[in-house]
Structure formats: C-alpha cells, structure tokens
Amino acid sequence: INGQGFTFKGAGIDIGKESIVNWNALYSSDDVLHKIGPGTLNVQKKQGANIKIGEGNVILNEEGTFNNIYLASGNGKVILNKDNSLGNDQYAGIFFTKRGGTLDLNGHNQTFTRIAATDDGTTITNSDTTKEAVLAINNEDSYIYHGNINGNIKLTHNINSQDKKTNAKLILDGSVNTKNDVEVSNASLTMQGHATEHAIFRSTASHCSLVFLCGTDWVTVLKETESSYNKKFNSDYKSNNQQTSFDQPDWKTGVFKFDTLHLNNADFSISRNANVEGNISANKSAITIGDKNAYIDNLAGKNITNNGFDFKQTISTNLSIGETKFTGGITAHNSQIAIGDQAVVTLNGATFLNNTPISIDKGAKVIAQNSMFTTKGIDISGELTMMGIPEQNSKTVTPGLHYAADGFRLSGGNANFIARNMASVTGNIYADDAATITLGQPETETPTISSAYQAWAETLLYGFDTAYRGAITAPKATVSMNNAIWHLNSQSSINRLETKDSMVRFTGDNGKFTTLTVDNLTIDDSAFVLRANLAQA
C-alpha cells in the first residue's frame, strides 16, 4: 500500500496467515490504527499515529515509527528493523496490557526507563543469533518488570552516578533466559517470584435505594461463608479481600538464567520463590541470596491506563520468606555476601572471595561443588557442605580445594559443617555451641577419582575421601570422621570425637607442643599419629 500526500483512516487492518502487507502510507494522526490477524504488517514510513495490535507481526522500519504501540492477548509481536524505531519517552512508546505480546529487538539495542508490562504475558527477545542486543532498563526509583527476557540479549541496569543509588531498584518477577551477561552499576537488582493474584469481592455495600425491594446481598453471604471455611482450614489469607498479600503461600516461581552477572558498586538480592542460575562477578557490592524482603505490585494486571497508553505502578515491600535457589560460581572483591533462611546455594563454579565476608544464616544451605577460596572467614549458622568437583557426563570427581584464611565460625546448635566427596579443606574451625562437624564418608560412597588427577588426589587426600587441615575449637560440638584425615596443626578441643577408618595426624610446628582435648572419644579402625623427640623420649 503506497501513498503520498494523503492519509488513511479506517476500522483497521486484518491480515491473513502467511500474508505480508507493505505499508508505505500514512495513517490519520487523530485515530488509532488497529491491526488483527496472524499476518505481517511491514511499516515502511513514520506514521505519527498510535497502533493497537491484537495478533500477528508488525515490523518497524523507521525511527519512531509510531507514537505509541499497544499489545494485548499475547498473540502480537513487534519487530525492530531499525535503531530507535520505538518512541523516546520513558516507556519507549510501547505498552503491554493483559497477556501482553512480544517485542523482538532483532539485533537492535533498546533503552527503557520502565517497561510498561502488566503481567508475564510480555516477552522481550532478540531473534538475531549473530548480533547481541543490549536491553537497558535505567529506572532511578523502584520498579517491577513482570515480563520475560530471553534470546540473544544483554541486560543492563546502570545508573550514571559516583554513588550507589539504592532507590534505583529494578525488581524482576517474571523470568530471564539468556546465555549473555547481566550488568548492574550504582544501582540495585532483585530477582524474585510473583505473588499470584486472587479474585476479590467488592469493598462497598450494595446500592439499593428502596430497601423493601432489595433481595439478599449475596456478596456479604459469600464473604462470610468463605471466611468461616478459611478459618477452619488455616487459610485466612484467602479472606483478606486483597488481590495479593505477603503471607500468601502461592507465589509463582521466577526462573532466571544468564552467563555472568557483573555487579559494580551495586546491590543484588534473590528473594522468595526465585531460581537463579549463572555466575556472579562483584566489586564493592552486596549480595543477598534468600532476602527476607519481597515486593508486590498492587496494580499488577491493571497497570495500563489512559486508553492503553500510560502506565501506573504502586509497590509494597514487607517481610516474606520463601525458598530461593542459586546455582553458579561467585567472584567478589571488597564486597559482602549473605545467605538467608530457606536459601539453597550450589556453588558449582569456582568461588574466589577477596576481602569479602560471607554469612550463612540458620535454615540456609550452601553446597560448594567446586574450589572455594576466601581471604576472610565464613560465618555459619546454617549448613555448609564442601565437596570435590563432579565431572560432566561422568561419575568421576576431581578433588576440590577449599580455603578460608580466617576460618569457619559456627554459631548455634543448628550449625552444620560438612566436608566429603574428595574435599580438601584448610582453615580453623570455631564453634560456640553444640554444632555438628562431619569429615568424610564411608569408602563405599567415595566416588572414583578422575584418572588425570590420581597423583594429585593422593598428595592432597593421602588415600582418604576427605582431608582437613587446621585446628578445631569446639568444646560443645561433635566431630565425626569417616574415611578422613585430619592434619591437626594447633591446639584443639572437642566435646565428642568419633573416628572410623580415619587418621588424626599431629602436624604442629617443630618445638611446639600440640594438644587435642576430647571429652568423649570413640575410635573404630583409626590411627592417631603423634610426632615424638626420640632422642629425649
């Protein structure tokens, strides 16, 4: 369709399947172009008008092709075929209402202050597999993006500032699935699940001016009936007549996958019902996995206003703890890491922490399946397990090196320290209560060592499943050893020591007397190797 010097105005365009309409005419600026049908509208001229898309593809070939774009139903797609082909306001002139639609960057970078998406029906992707597209979200106050991000995209949330802008919080409660990086500078990023919306009753009384003609107010009856049943079955959250609440148990799980998350002077948190996979590289940043705070958009599902071309959001935050998962490796400098209640962290990538303290709260579990080094200590109120490195597509394991310069500090009776599966651990252990310390596992459970590392494993592990080097100061704790060797290099004290098929080897400095004090000792097929000065014996 071609035209010069005139505008088109009509009910809209319905394009059939596998059909393409090349649009080289102008649509009337005082009307809204409606596009339906599964076919493609290829827009070749800047329109100066708005468009609403219910189905099919719309290709944008000019800068600012439309003033505003509206997508609904989830069946429409906008494809960028030129840089800056969207608008230049904070929403880039595109609005995703109920069930949204897809924005395909198609190899073009795109910047938003906020993405006007009302639910997880919105997807931003890049179908160009050869050219990475940068999706920049630069909000400077709290904002929740409910949609999905996938394809060949690099996501950035960078604030141009000398100082960290803690209010510049980007909250993702949809999903991310990319093999590329995520980058955050001078700002905050949260990944979490999404509180499921519930139907609610009207909050006002029924309108009936002639009372004697009014029937039963069934809304009130239903509310009272629902409330009584929910009290009976301990599901009171269903009777609060709120679309969402922090104490409700039904949250959708958000899944977030990326290559590496780069943090510079930034805050990153994983809150309830989030499953995050990827590596983290942090500098002067704070990482919280299992954050006790969560966020709710009180207008979720109803964010799009003003006839489809505006966006509103009201965010609440409160305590709301749920299970979180993180899988990857962490490299951090001059940062801090906190692992919160109900967090499960699997460090399957190498972890190097320089001047970066880490704490593991009660109820949290950390499994280090790769080497871990820290120049600080590790505070443990939950559970830390250190292991060897499982080889992909194989049952063999490479020994894992774990080192804490300031040692491992166990607090409370629920603290649990475990080293097994070809782990070599160095660092003193301190426990202030009846903690549990487990070294090694039965020989029948010990995995096969990778053939390329047999000699190295023998040097590290002395033929045992696990090797530990350091002193243990834990007068109330229990230490269990099974197929393990303990190189005891300084004064140690333990409430209970149980050894099976193991060795305790005193390796203190020459000329220094090393003492192991144990209140209760159980030995099964084990050895204690003590050095002696035979010339003076």
Regions found by a protein language model. Give the residues of each.
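His/acidic/aromatic-lined binding-pocket segments of jelly-roll/cupin-type domains
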Residues: 32-34, 50-52, 68-70, 181-182, ...
